[in-house]
């Protein structure tokens, strides 16, 4: 039921802005298996969150998926990319400028899976004035950014 409410919210949002600028959904990678490994896989909970993201975004007409060089971002995006038959584009985590350039050139909606320490800078670079911080243990945020002359932000949360 919680998934349904979120899906309906996103569908209404997309219908409202159908003729407007593309929507970029930005999420932090899902929970990782080990804090000790520099490039860990997702944990079981993280895999569940990645699957939930694909379900949440299934009607969002995602045409581009952007991930970093780290497995946790790639594994978080994989179910959504598979569902939309989209090959993810890898952009280095520290190259926000290159990512912003690609996002501003979009003709469709996109998913960006990043990191808690890079998403605030990405949002700022896209024109979101309100500062955002993501606690180290928070994997629940979904940022929907309407990329255009005046970027707008809608903050959503996973239902778990």
Predicted regions and their residues:
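Short beta-strand segments
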Residues: 113-115
